[in-house]
Amino acid sequence: MGDIRKIVFEENKLEKKLCRLVGQAICDFGMIEDGDKVMVCVSGGKDSYAMLDLLMKLRERAPINFEIVAVNLDQKQPNFPTNILPNYLKSLDIQYHIEEQDTYSIVKRVIPDGKTTCGLCSRLRRGILYRVADELGATKIALGHHRDDILETLMLNMFYAGKLKGMPPKLRSDDGKHIVIRPLAYVPEKLLERYSADMNFPIIPCDLCGSQPNLQRQVMKEMLRDWEKKHPGRVENLFRSMHHIVPSHLMDGEAFDFKNLEISSELSGIAARSSGDRAIDEADLDELACGTLIQGTYNPPL
């Protein structure tokens, strides 16, 4: 009996932590507003299932009113079980829509065997989801990318594209007509793995990206997990650095006007928080060495 109580306690503790992280991200970035209709994109993977579940829980206790409509894009992948998602969504008693579009055949026809399919697949999906959002009258489009996805994107851009660029928690589409949000932006993947197992979500594997083990993104994922094991706090601080950008100590002339930099007796704005001549903030390093700076799971600023 004691073991069962302990399991239930741990499950409730995890759910509360996830709700807090998702709620914090929503507040920090103004993701959801009163009267919004949020189109929650559900792929059949652990992340999107968890996102839908957590948004439904938060909606019950939120001080604002917003609608949820779950949307799945059936890309006609071989062996895709067409009944699992409709049955699951129907059991939740929420509005949902299944969009059937054979993007799988297009991707397989255009991309040679052995080449990465993610780029074309994501572009096709994006266009379809934008259209569906218009048809459903959705004001926000929620995607299930989590903290680790954001860090992997940051490192991919740094290592392979030479850009200091990540994956934003909230963005406006290129056509200016849609707002995309990522409510799981603060959530580490390992917590979603635990939550998915606890909730027993009916996971559906992807026969496109899920069958490409040598992707560079997978290399980044393994690197992050190795860091978490060998260097506690490193991944959390890497993520924290995305919240504390100091353009004056980088090299982008568009982000900081180096050419017109002059001697001044007063500092304001970015210059005031640039730490002047210091490239390394020793106080933070001292705290980290003492084990007092961001240990364990990332906690966003309150």
From Swiss-Prot:
<keyword id="KW-0004">4Fe-4S</keyword>
<dbReference type="GO" id="GO:0000049">
    <property type="term" value="F:tRNA binding"/>
</dbReference>
<dbReference type="InterPro" id="IPR012089">
    <property type="entry name" value="tRNA_Cyd_32_2_STrfase"/>
</dbReference>
<dbReference type="GO" id="GO:0005737">
    <property type="term" value="C:cytoplasm"/>
</dbReference>
<dbReference type="GO" id="GO:0000287">
    <property type="term" value="F:magnesium ion binding"/>
</dbReference>
<comment type="function">
    <text>Catalyzes the ATP-dependent 2-thiolation of cytidine in position 32 of tRNA, to form 2-thiocytidine (s(2)C32). The sulfur atoms are provided by the cysteine/cysteine desulfurase (IscS) system.</text>
</comment>
<dbReference type="InterPro" id="IPR014729">
    <property type="entry name" value="Rossmann-like_a/b/a_fold"/>
</dbReference>
<keyword id="KW-0547">Nucleotide-binding</keyword>
<dbReference type="GO" id="GO:0005524">
    <property type="term" value="F:ATP binding"/>
</dbReference>
<dbReference type="InterPro" id="IPR011063">
    <property type="entry name" value="TilS/TtcA_N"/>
</dbReference>
<feature type="binding site">
    <location>
        <position position="121"/>
    </location>
    <ligand>
        <name>[4Fe-4S] cluster</name>
    </ligand>
</feature>
<keyword id="KW-0808">Transferase</keyword>
<dbReference type="GO" id="GO:0051539">
    <property type="term" value="F:4 iron, 4 sulfur cluster binding"/>
</dbReference>
<dbReference type="GO" id="GO:0016783">
    <property type="term" value="F:sulfurtransferase activity"/>
</dbReference>
<comment type="similarity">
    <text>Belongs to the TtcA family.</text>
</comment>
<keyword id="KW-0411">Iron-sulfur</keyword>
<dbReference type="Pfam" id="PF01171">
    <property type="entry name" value="ATP_bind_3"/>
</dbReference>
<keyword id="KW-0067">ATP-binding</keyword>
<keyword id="KW-0694">RNA-binding</keyword>
<comment type="pathway">
    <text>tRNA modification.</text>
</comment>
<feature type="binding site">
    <location>
        <position position="209"/>
    </location>
    <ligand>
        <name>[4Fe-4S] cluster</name>
    </ligand>
</feature>
<feature type="short sequence motif" description="PP-loop motif">
    <location>
        <begin position="43"/>
        <end position="48"/>
    </location>
</feature>
<keyword id="KW-0963">Cytoplasm</keyword>
<keyword id="KW-0820">tRNA-binding</keyword>
<dbReference type="GO" id="GO:0034227">
    <property type="term" value="P:tRNA thio-modification"/>
</dbReference>
<protein>
    <recommendedName>
        <fullName>tRNA-cytidine(32) 2-sulfurtransferase</fullName>
        <ecNumber>2.8.1.-</ecNumber>
    </recommendedName>
</protein>
<comment type="subunit">
    <text>Homodimer.</text>
</comment>
<dbReference type="InterPro" id="IPR035107">
    <property type="entry name" value="tRNA_thiolation_TtcA_Ctu1"/>
</dbReference>
<keyword id="KW-0460">Magnesium</keyword>
<feature type="binding site">
    <location>
        <position position="118"/>
    </location>
    <ligand>
        <name>[4Fe-4S] cluster</name>
    </ligand>
</feature>
<keyword id="KW-0408">Iron</keyword>
<keyword id="KW-0819">tRNA processing</keyword>
<keyword id="KW-0479">Metal-binding</keyword>
